[in-house]
């Protein structure tokens, strides 16, 4: 799987996941990203006209906090039903 750059505003975050945001962790990650760059891409899957976050909530929020417009992501397959 290749890493791709995705516009942050095209990534959907389900409401229940928003409750999992840890402001202290987001701040620490933002500082780390400023110093070293994003070391581990987030994971998303394709949804209807957008991407859905699979993994990397705190990293995504840190990128938003830094004012970034895009984020490096790995696009994974949809879950099997």
Question: Each predicted region: which residue ranges?
Answer:
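A short acidic, often aromatic-flanked loop/helix-cap motif at beta-alpha or helix-coil junctions
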Residues: 79-81
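Short, charged/polar connector segments at secondary-structure boundaries
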Residues: 1-77
């Amino acid at each position: 799987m290749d890493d791709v750059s995705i516009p942050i505003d095209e990534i959907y975050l389900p409401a229940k996941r928003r409750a999992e945001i840890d402001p202290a962790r987001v701040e620490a990650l933002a500082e780390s990203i400023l110093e070293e760059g994003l070391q581990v891409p987030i994971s998303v899957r394709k949804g209807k006209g957008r991407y859905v976050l699979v993994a990397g909530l705190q990293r995504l929020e840190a990128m938003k906090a830094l004012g970034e417009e895009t984020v490096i992501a790995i696009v994974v397959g949809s879950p099997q039903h």
